[in-house]
Amino acid sequence: MNGTEGNNFYIPMSNRTGLVRSPYEYPQYYLAEPWQFKLLAVYMFFLMCFGFPINGLTLVVTAQHKKLRQPLNFILVNLAVAGTIMVCFGFTVTFYTAINGYFVLGPTGCAIEGFMATLGGQISLWSLVVLAIERYIVVCKPMGSFKFSSNHAFAGIGFTWIMALSCAAPPLVGWSRYIPEGMQCSCGPDYYTLNPDYNNESYVLYMFCCHFIFPVTTIFFTYGRLVCTVKAAAAQQQESESTQKAEREVTRMVILMVLGFLVAWTPYASVAAWIFFNRGAAFSAQFMAVPAFFSKSSSIFNPIIYVLLNKQFRNCMLTTLFCGKNPLGDDESSTVSTSKTEVSSVSPA
């Protein structure tokens, strides 16, 4: 065994060294140099400084401008809510613990931080699944003529929360557990031990299959079909240029959001899977800490992509920031509205 299992923690270092201490009570500077903990704190502070304003601004701008309250935008707002949850209840805790060099808030604080981080990440993932399915239904039209309405959007949002809770809640009630990971400054599900009291193995398999592989496969399938349909429609010139442009813009935005999520979370999922299937193998604290902390950057990807690629939202945001005046002077009426993209008619291939 190349690690040390204790009460609600696992340290990736053998206790034969005599250095291992509880991550809830002592600084973990034997795992990494103090400057590395400070660097993680600086990184978390950076994410807090960008993540909270940009996600909060997304919520405020959508609330202030009625024209943005379109069904598709409700899902995007749900992504901003997920990002805000991660910033407020996850990043602040991790910033504080990284400064101290250990998880100073104890097992209860670890469970709360792990739950919030998992919940926010899962809401983001399942929101992207809903967006992918919406794009597939609207563009590929497997159900014929279909309009994505507010009722569909709210049902999709409810679905994302149910799926997210079904992943994040079990470790709170005894199916697996949340423990410090990497450099012991942030918490996640227990991939590290086979503790029979918590049935870790069955939970990790459930999480990987139902809450990563299945949603990612769904996203790839829907976008594979979507790309084929859009290419076929463009080749046949079945739709007007403006309609095709609107579909391409919305689809490109959602695809970039998906890619952003995968870039942020795939390294973490891959390392967690390696640890799970190679229990007892030696690995450094940084081996898990780097992808774990990098995955947190997903909270700022989606709103940045949304602002950059959605001209209507960008104009509304500038109007809000500059007290009713857009310094760029862009005409919002020139922007293709979200509602138009929802009712467009791209014939199936």
Curated annotation (Swiss-Prot):
Main subcellular localisation: membrane
A Pfam family reported for this protein in Swiss-Prot or TrEMBL: 7tm_1
Post-translational note: Phosphorylated on some or all of the serine and threonine residues present in the C-terminal region.
Residue ranges, Cytoplasmic side: 62-73, 134-152, 231-252, 310-349
A Gene Ontology term for the protein's cellular component: photoreceptor outer segment
Glycosylation sites noted in the Swiss-Prot or TrEMBL record: 2, 15, 200
GO molecular function: G protein-coupled photoreceptor activity
Composition-biased stretches (Low complexity): 334-349
Disordered: annotated span: 329-349
Topological domain spans for side Extracellular: 1-36, 100-113, 177-202, 277-284
Topology versus the membrane: Multi-pass membrane protein
InterPro entries: GPCR_opsins, GPCR_Rhodpsn, GPCR_Rhodpsn_7TM, Opsin, Retinal_BS, Rhodopsin, Rhodopsin_N
Keyword ATP-binding carried by entry: no
General function of this protein: Visual pigments are the light-absorbing molecules that mediate vision. They consist of an apoprotein, opsin, covalently linked to cis-retinal.
Record family assignment: Belongs to the G-protein coupled receptor 1 family. Opsin subfamily.
Protein's name according to its UniProt entry: Green-sensitive opsin-3
Species for this entry: Danio rerio (Zebrafish)
